């Protein structure tokens, strides 16, 4: 496999072409952003840790029947993945009220929800990734109703697998956001990453935040939180 030109650079990753048309290399950066890019910084070795965490979790999900874009981890910062067309939706899963949902609905952070909440945001930086529903998604051509059903079914399974896996490591999975892509044959697969950048992890005993909220809210010890998550799931 030969790594070729950069195809795309986002806030946290770079995507490179390879000598295989259906495979790409994803490089994880140390750049950190919050509040739709209003706050920017660097977290030492974040890219290394997120690459390792995502690789471990995607391998676990694959073993339990979840199709992903992940092929293999290449080195500390890079992984080889299937080339996909990203569905322009972020799927947000909320098991406990926190962050923007708690603020939006006037709930105390940490409030247990009577059911898991699934939300969609439309991936558009200029618009600030607005919340939309499935009808909006279909109306603007982001996905079909059939694709939405597939995505929600996969997301529910992913949530159950991850909640159980993290509970074994004394971590509560408060909420997370994921993205999906379509392969050349139309198959929908889990894409992007699952890491402390995209999830809220709270220690089940102390309630300590072990995720990017430490950067967002200037709580300090940001790197230590990422290291702790990697340490627990690497056992």
UniProtKB/Swiss-Prot annotation:
It catalyses: 5-amino-1-(5-phospho-D-ribosyl)imidazole-4-carboxylate + L-aspartate + ATP = (2S)-2-[5-amino-1-(5-phospho-beta-D-ribosyl)imidazole-4-carboxamido]succinate + ADP + phosphate + 2 H(+). Pfam families: SAICAR_synt. One of its GO terms (molecular function) is ATP binding. InterPro entries: SAICAR_synt/ADE2_N, SAICAR_synt_PurC, SAICAR_synth, SAICAR_synthetase, SAICAR_synthetase_CS. Pathway: Purine metabolism; IMP biosynthesis via de novo pathway; 5-amino-1-(5-phospho-D-ribosyl)imidazole-4-carboxamide from 5-amino-1-(5-phospho-D-ribosyl)imidazole-4-carboxylate: step 1/2. One of its GO terms (biological process) is 'de novo' IMP biosynthetic process. SUPFAM superfamilies: SAICAR synthase-like (SSF56104). Coiled coil: none annotated. The keyword Protein transport does not apply. The keyword Nucleotide-binding applies. Its EC number is 6.3.2.6. Keywords: ATP-binding, Ligase, Nucleotide-binding, Purine biosynthesis. PANTHER family: MULTIFUNCTIONAL PROTEIN ADE2, SI:DKEY-6E2.2. This is Phosphoribosylaminoimidazole-succinocarboxamide synthase. The gene is purC.
């Amino acid at each position: 496999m030969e790594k070729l030109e950069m195809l795309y650079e986002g806030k946290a990753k770079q995507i490179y072409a390879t000598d295989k048309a259906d495979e790409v290399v994803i490089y994880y950066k140390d750049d950190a952003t919050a509040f739709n890019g209003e706050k920017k910084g660097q977290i030492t070795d974040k890219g290394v840790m997120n690459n390792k965490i995502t690789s471990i979790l995607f391998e676990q999900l694959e073993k339990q029947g979840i199709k992903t874009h992940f092929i293999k981890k290449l080195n500390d910062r890079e992984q080889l993945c299937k080339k996909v067309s990203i569905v322009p939706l972020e799927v947000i899963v909320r098991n406990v009220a926190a962050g923007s949902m708690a603020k939006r609905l006037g709930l105390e952070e940490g409030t247990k929800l009577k059911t898991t909440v699934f939300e969609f945001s439309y991936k558009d930086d200029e618009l600030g990734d607005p919340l939309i529903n499935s009808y909006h998604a279909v109306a603007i051509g982001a996905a079909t109703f059939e694709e939405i059903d597939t995505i929600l079914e996969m997301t529910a399974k992913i949530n159950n697998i991850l909640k159980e896996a993290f509970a074994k490591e004394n971590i509560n999975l408060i909420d997370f956001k994921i993205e999906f892509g379509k392969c050349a044959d139309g198959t929908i697969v889990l894409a992007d990453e699952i890491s402390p950048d995209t999830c809220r992890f709270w220690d089940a005993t102390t309630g300590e935040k072990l995720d990017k909220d430490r950067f967002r809210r200037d709580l300090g010890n940001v790197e230590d939180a990422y290291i702790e998550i990697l340490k627990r799931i690497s056992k």
